[in-house]
Every structure is written in C-alpha cells, then in structure tokens.
Amino acid sequence: MKRILNKLFSKLVLGGLIIILQFSWFVYLLYSATVYSSMVDALFKIASIVLALFVSSRDMRSTYKTSWIFLILALPLFGIPAYYLFGRPGLTKRTRMKMDVVSSRIRAYSSPSDDVMSALRAEDDSAGQQAQYLARYAGYPVYREADTQYYCCGEEMYPQFLEDLKTAKSYIFLEYFIAEPGKMLDAIVEILAQKVKEGVDVRFMYDGIGCIQTLPNKYYCYLQEKGIKCACFQPFRPLMSIIQNNRDHRKITVIDGKVAYTGGMNLADEYINARVRFGYWKDAAIRLTGECVWSFTSMFLELWDYILKIESDYTFYRATSMEKHRLQEKIHADEKGFVQPYTDSPLDHEDVGENVYLNIISRAKKYLYIFTPYLIIGSEMRTALVNAAKSGVDVRLVVPGIPDKKLVYFLTQSNFPYLIKNGVKIYTYTPGFIHAKCFVSDDVQATVGTVNMDYRSLCLHFECGVWMYRTRAVLQVKEDALKTFAESHEVTLEEFQKKSFLVRTFMGALKLFAPLL
C-alpha cells in the first residue's frame, strides 16, 4: 500500500497532473473563446491553417510532418498547443547561444588528424565518407588503434567497470540518464567516495526527468556530502515548457582520460539483472581506451560547463603527448581499426544519430544486424531498411519480447507488416527486454551507443555513441547478434494478421501520435 501511495504522490505524477491541468485549462480557454466569438473561431481556424502550412515547409521528417499537420487541422484545440509544447525540436534561442559558446570553446581542443582520415580513406573510401561526415557535423575526429571491448550484458561489464573506477588517480566523470540507489549505484558511490578521499576529482551528472522517479529528494546533497560534485540537466518543473522535451539521454563514464564507457546502460539494478524488470534485461556497453577517450571527456565537460556556467581548464584534461604514447602502447595487438565517438544534439538541427544509422544501412552489402528497444521510425528509415533487404542484404532487427511501454510497443509492432513483406527479418527477444542500441554490418563497421530508433532519440535528445571500423568490437557485436537471434523468435506476417481488426486499426491510429511518444 505504501509503495502504491508513493507512486501516486511521486514528483512525476504530481508534476504531470499539474502540467495536464495547465494544458487542459489552456485548451478550455481556447474552446470558450471560439464558442462565444465567431470572429475568434474564424481567426483560430485561420491560425491552424497557417501553422499547418508552416509545418509543411519545415525541414523535418515527412512522417512526423504528416502527423502534426493532421493533429493541427483535425483537432486544432489539441493540436496547436501540443505542437507548441512537443513539436519544436530545438531549445530556446538563448539556451542555444549559451551552449554554442561552450561548444566552440571546447571543440578547439578536438582538432582532426588529417593523417588518420587519409589512412581510412585509402583503406575504404566509403568508410572515410562516414568519418568525414561525423568530423564535420558531430565535431569529433576519427582515431586509429583504440582498444575496444564490447559487453553483451550489464553483468558482464559491471566487474570491469568497478575495477576501472578503483584505478582512478586524477578524475572520474559520470553522465547518465537514469540512476537509482541499489546494489549497482551503491557500490559505485562507495568507490567514488573513497576516490574523493584520495584526492580524485569526481563528478556526477544526471538528467532531471530521467531520475525524477529513481533518485530520492536531495540525493545530490547526499553525494555532495561525500565530496562528489553533482549537476542536474534541466531539472523537472511542472510548467508547460518546450525545454522539458530535450533530455540528456547520454551514458558516459570517463576515468583519467584513459578509459571511457558508453552504450545503453544506466546506473540501476535492472541493467545488471540484480532486479527483474520485464524478464531478462539485455543491454550493451563498450569500453574504450586510447586517444579517442578525449572525445568523451570533452562531451562531458561541454554539458557540465553549460549547466554550472563555468569554464573548465581543458588543457588540464587533455592528455600530453607522452601520455598519448603510453596509451598507444597498451592497445590490444589485433586493434588496427578506426574509432570515432560522436554526439547528437537538438541544437544544430543535424540528425547525426539517424544519419550514422542511415549511412551504415546504405553501405551494407552482405548483412545488417540491429538491436533496438523501440521501432518508431519515419519513411526515410523504413525505405532505407527495405531497399537494403531488396538489394540482397540480410537485414535483421531484434526488438523486445516483453515491452516496457505498452503504447510504444504497439507503435513498434505497427511497423512490422511493411518491413516483413519487403524482406526485413524481425525478431522479438524471448527472454525479456532488449535495451541495447547497436548496428553491425559486414564484419566491417558497427556502432554502439544511446540512440534509440524513435522520434525522441533521433530528434529531441542529447545522445552519444561510437562508430567503429574493423575493430575487434565489430566482430564481438556480430557474435552477440548471432547468439541473440538463437534466443529470439522470428515474427511472421501470419502472426500479425491474426491480430484482431480493432488492434490493427488502433496500431494504425497510433502512428498519428508518434511524435508525442
């Protein structure tokens, strides 16, 4: 009973109710104005047409554009305020300007290496084009001979993660969307507190919405008492505001500028299967060493400086030439490939995460294997997947067998028929929920990161990942994919057609609301 009451009176529920009341009151005022004044009603209809024309002219995915135009014209009292809140992908102009200042300052320390880019282009011009795109639009260079270790689940990664934290001598940076006290986080905090006593600079950054239900009130005070510096990205406020849209969905750990982790894993017990949620929780993480770690260091510092309104001494964190040399000496013997970390931001209107995926799809020749927890994609992504399958590429996607969000899962399933009809194989992960976000193709390239195949990840959130070419982690991702297929169920068109007419109609109708989910 106490647990139920805690959920009912949680910050998210109460804050959500306040926002719903504000939204409802706003809609009611609009409705009242249109009912009592024919002139206002006419002006409102004109406004809906003007807004629909504006949306149609915007540079955005056609699928989401269609959804918004339908909502604005068919349900203007709902669609217009909803578009104001959820339809605009960018942060406020003032926020963008502040972040641009920080970004330009730190990017000066991430100069690309022409030699590495030339070597990649000489080996594979197509891969070089991908790297060139990331260097130009994500702002982070490609590196050579970084050590990459892929982990197929949280419990495989966790012991090494703790050991790496214990080796820290200078600093530890952690940036996560979700953190929740329990076996995993408590053990990490214990190590961090000890490291603070040893003089290590420990910083922890978390998302205000992601942690609203998981972190106790004033948990940051608890951490600060232990000497751990904290920053919260966009704290939740129960107000109708566009800034609630843009979340920090990244997962980053950096240790002394020598070791970095990223992937789908947050800091909560389900990610290491110490707590059962939606069956077995399958995720993915990647450990990196070498010069490429600097990219993750700068990603962290960029957001940290913005939140706290400070200017870090980036030269302190940038490895010296001698340190770079020592890092290179430790690289695994079979690591001769290329690595390029990247971040995606809603500030620049450049969909880096999606374009990385589209580039991998378009360049696949033999196979393309994908892990994703959600499949809410636009026509561009659907067309790319289908074209690859029709061209003879073995295209396979794995989605959860047990979903975490029922409505979102209906939307995911609504994409099945078209893809299956056109040769794309779709598997549901029988043991439970798959939260990994991975692409791997042709034993040559792969990406592991935080980018879901849904509107929010592709358009609205701060995300990150690492693109790899001919590293040992590429083959490790492939091996994991093959094992996962064996544990999963391949969906057939006949199965989908057995669903009732009402269910299939409901799935189709949900597509109109995809941008809101």
Regions picked out by a protein language model, each given a short descriptive name:
Residues F371-T372, V399, Y429, V448-G449:
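Thr-Gly-centered strand-to-loop micro-motif
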Residues T383, Y409-Q413:
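Short glycine/threonine-rich loop-to-helix capping motif typified by GTGT followed
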Residues K437:
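Catalytic-core elements of nucleic-acid end-processing and repair enzymes
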